[in-house]
């Protein structure tokens, strides 16, 4: 770390959250700066762009009142970092890691760069083991595995904030590792009332005791928004790879992050890509999502559940499209289910957890879990097909088996997907077996005769 250097007379102009300076000092990209205004107020900034004769600094606080002639620049000589230490759980921070809960800063036993630890791919281990979210459509059908990155695709007006809060309150590990579990909850570009509802829900449920919260408000600068997930993931890496905890990071809403990235890119004068987003958005998102994982030489894990809203309900939009290339599946919310008061309105058919097989089945959840999940998928897909037939030819033209599928589809949505309270995996599986009892044995082709006799018909006779 270099000695802090102060320079004056470098500022040329201020545009939104950006400060344009003459390049008269030796700095690097992403290096931290202190910007001292004429009023004596110190603001944090970072070097965003370096050119031959100038540099652009992102100011991470409001630039209101920041002049040009009387602005001083203090060069810190290192990238932006976050001080971390014990007693991190239960704390609430703002966009850039400053306390919002009225308590003093966390005693810094260690300072970590917010752009993440450089992990040799050879050190990575295969994600495995099950995280119970309390949501049947996820736990039973699209299971979340420690070390996975599994996004939740929503749309404007759907209850993704409510679902994210519910998962943060309910999520847990099964077995002896439960006391090593932690949540990092990140609100990105959220309104004040939403941020307060997040905070109130976590405090009321008692989940705040094993949670760290980072809240970026909608009226804060775009530059701050770009740093919020990085500060949060730095705290998560400390919990996972220093304190050896199993950490679940819930980030909502990554669409707000990408919109901020487009805004900042445009203000830099960069050439836009698809729909105005910068061409490097893929690598930028990867620098966030790829911080999830497991390491051979650490007991802790870092799992991500990012939430994003589909602009215009378009799953082919660059934001969900690029996210899908990086992550390992998706959980998809559905407007039609939401209109029918199904909560959570998760459409299990387009949803997918690519790593589900590594955390479910014998030795992880239940030996019959994979078979039950496969049979429910197949049966519900048939039920949706029969609904289309019924809309064309009417119920009178359907066979008896098709009518049974119609009843199964309705019961599956109302009894299995829909839930008013958290469920354990055992409760979710019991509902799944019970719903399959509506179908004849000949249709249960994904189950063995033993499974049909023990779970499906045995339960239907109770």
Kindly label every feature range from the protein language model:
Residues 1-133:
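Acidic-enriched and Gly/Ser
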Residues 140-461:
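P-loop NTPase catalytic core
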């Amino acid at each position: 770390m270099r000695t802090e250097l102060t320079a004056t007379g470098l500022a040329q102009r201020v545009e939104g959250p950006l400060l344009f300076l003459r390049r008269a000092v030796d700095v690097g990209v992403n290096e931290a700066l202190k910007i001292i205004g004429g009023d004596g107020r110190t603001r944090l900034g970072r070097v965003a762009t370096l050119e031959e004769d100038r540099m652009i600094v992102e100011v991470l606080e409001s630039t209101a009142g920041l002049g040009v002639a009387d602005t001083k620049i203090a060069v810190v000589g290192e990238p932006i970092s976050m001080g971390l230490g014990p007693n991190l759980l239960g704390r609430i921070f703002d966009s850039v890691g400053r306390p919002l809960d009225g308590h003093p800063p966390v005693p810094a036993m260690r300072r970590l760069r917010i752009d993440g630890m450089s992990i040799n791919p050879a050190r990575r281990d295969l994600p495995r083991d099950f995280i119970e979210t309390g949501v049947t459509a996820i736990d039973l059908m699209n299971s979340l595995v420690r070390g996975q990155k599994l996004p939740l695709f929503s749309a404007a007006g759907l209850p993704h904030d409510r679902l994210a809060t519910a998962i943060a309150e309910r999520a847990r590990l099964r077995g002896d590792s439960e006391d090593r579990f932690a949540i990092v909850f990140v609100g990105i570009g959220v309104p004040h009332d939403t941020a307060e509802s997040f905070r109130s829900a976590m405090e009321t449920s008692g989940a705040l005791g094993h949670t760290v919260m980072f809240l970026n408000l909608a009226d804060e600068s775009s530059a701050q928004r770009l740093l919020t997930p990085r500060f949060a993931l730095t705290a998560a890496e400390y919990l996972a790879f220093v304190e050896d905890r199993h950490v679940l990071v819930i980030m909502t809403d990554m669409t707000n992050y990408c919109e901020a990235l487009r805004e900042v890119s445009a203000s830099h004068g960069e050439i836009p890509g698809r729909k105005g987003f910068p061409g490097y958005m893929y690598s930028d998102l990867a620098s966030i999502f790829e911080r999830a994982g497991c390491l051979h030489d650490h007991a802790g894990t870092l799992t991500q559940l990012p939430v994003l809203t589909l602009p215009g309900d378009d799953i082919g939009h660059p934001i969900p499209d690029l996210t899908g290339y990086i992550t390992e599946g998706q959980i998809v919310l559905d407007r039609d289910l939401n209109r029918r008061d199904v909560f959570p309105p998760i459409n299990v058919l387009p949803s997918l957890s690519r790593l589900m097989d590594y955390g479910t089945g014998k030795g992880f959840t239940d030996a019959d879990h994979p078979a039950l999940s496969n049979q429910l998928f197949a049966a519900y897909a048939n039920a949706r097909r029969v609904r289309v037939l019924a809309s064309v030819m009417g119920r009178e033209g359907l066979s008896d088996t098709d009518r049974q599928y119609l009843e199964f589809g309705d019961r599956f949505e109302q009894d299995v997907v829909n839930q008013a309270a958290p469920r354990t995996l055992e409760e979710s599986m019991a509902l799944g077996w019970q719903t399959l009892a509506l179908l004849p044995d000949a249709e249960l082709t994904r189950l063995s005769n033993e499974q049909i006799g023990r779970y499906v018909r045995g339960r239907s006779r109770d």
